A protein has these predicted regions:
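Conserved glycine-rich cofactor-binding loop
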Residues: 44-45
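Conserved glycine-rich Rossmann-like NAD(P)H-binding loop of the short-chain dehydrogenase/reductase
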Residues: 58-73
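Rossmann-fold cofactor-recognition segment
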Residues: 78-96
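Catalytic loop of short-chain dehydrogenase/reductase
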Residues: 122-124, 154-227, 239
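C-terminal helical subdomain
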Residues: 140, 199, 206-207, 212-215, ...
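Short, small/polar-rich loop/turn modules that mediate ligand/substrate recognition or access, typified
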Residues: 226, 231, 286-288
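Short C-terminal tail/terminal secondary-structure segment
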Residues: 287-312
């Protein structure tokens, strides 16, 4: 991943009456002069941008991505919706880059929520790239959030239904705690777990393991986050009709939707509504859990497995 980083982010500000009212609404939540800020990683992608359209109604937005062209396009879309966005070119695998992202967000107001959608699919790179982006990126974003956020803030991490498909014996869960102690040892352990898999399936396996890690992190760290008055949740989407989701259509996701009688692919907007709810005050008691939103694929798989065993 290219480590593009700009100390001076592109600021997109609006001077329209509707935008002013929305900024005033954001300030009123925390009192006079205070702005409620939402950070969305992968904010230029399908689910990230869809979430920004919702959260931006009453939050100042900070979007990050590694592609400036996508950020600029997202900013233009939000501007047309009378929403204010600050865009930051940030590599989530780089802790310093993530720290700078949160510094920028804190400079705009109080960080109330983080929606961590940044990630890559198996078709986008080799196993190490997939693991580093999805797992190490999650640690970086969450640990900086934990260190810098105030009581009442919430974060939602995007996992995947793929994390629910791996047999437990194939998940290197004993290696997961290393992510909080020794990044090099953690990545080495993850590589060792992936290496026995044939090359053609290694990225897919790394993806499932990396998303299993996201689930593990979001549940195992809940007590620690509770200690600072913070909430942490993960959501496991199924096959979603986005640019990244469609990359996997030929690799099996499309066939899976058909095989398990799911009537259609999920929509980015449907995932976004759930993400926005998870970090909202309405979900103030929700933490330390994973929400599977897959159109029933995993339920069908488990029932078919049960029936097959019963009839064997």
């Amino acid at each position: 991943m290219h480590r593009w980083f700009h100390n001076r982010p592109r600021m997109v500000s609006l001077h329209l009456r509707k935008g002013s009212r929305r900024r005033a609404a954001a300030r009123s939540i925390y009192g006079p002069g205070m702005t409620r800020v939402s950070v969305i990683t992968g904010g230029a992608g399908g689910m990230g941008l869809a979430t920004a359209r919702i959260v931006g109604r009453d939050h100042a937005l900070v979007l990050c991505d590694v592609r400036q062209d996508r950020l600029d396009a997202a900013a233009a879309i939000l501007k047309d919706l009378d929403m204010t966005a600050t865009v930051v070119n940030c590599d989530v695998t780089d802790r310093q880059s993530v720290t700078r992202l949160f510094e920028i967000a804190a400079g705009l107001g109080t960080v109330a929520s983080v929606i961590h959608t940044a990630g890559v699919s198996p078709s986008m790179g080799d196993a190490d790239y997939v693991m580093r982006t999805n797992a190490v990126g999650t640690v970086n974003v969450n640990e900086v959030f934990f260190r810098t956020s105030v009581e009442g803030a919430a974060i939602v991490n995007v996992a995947s239904m793929a994390a629910h498909m791996l047999p437990e014996e194939l998940i290197p869960a004993s290696q997961f705690p290393l992510a909080l102690q020794d990044e090099a040892a953690f990545t080495a352990g993850m590589s060792s777990a992936c290496n026995p898999i044939p090359v053609e399936g290694r990225s897919g396996f790394a993806y499932a393991v990396s998303k299993s890690f996201v689930r593990w992190y979001s549940t195992s760290q809940a007590e620690r986050f509770n200690g600072r008055g913070l909430r942490i949740v993960s959501v496991s989407p199924g096959s979603v009709d986005t640019e990244m989701g469609k990359l996997e259509e030929q690799a099996g996701a499309g066939a899976m939707v058909a095989d398990f009688a799911v009537p259609r692919w999920g929509k980015a907007e449907e995932m976004a509504e759930l993400f926005a709810f998870c970090v909202s005050d309405k979900a103030g008691y929700l933490t330390g859990t994973d929400i599977l939103n897959d159109g029933g694929v995993i339920a069908s798989m488990r029932e078919r497995t049960r029936l097959a065993a019963e009839n064997a």
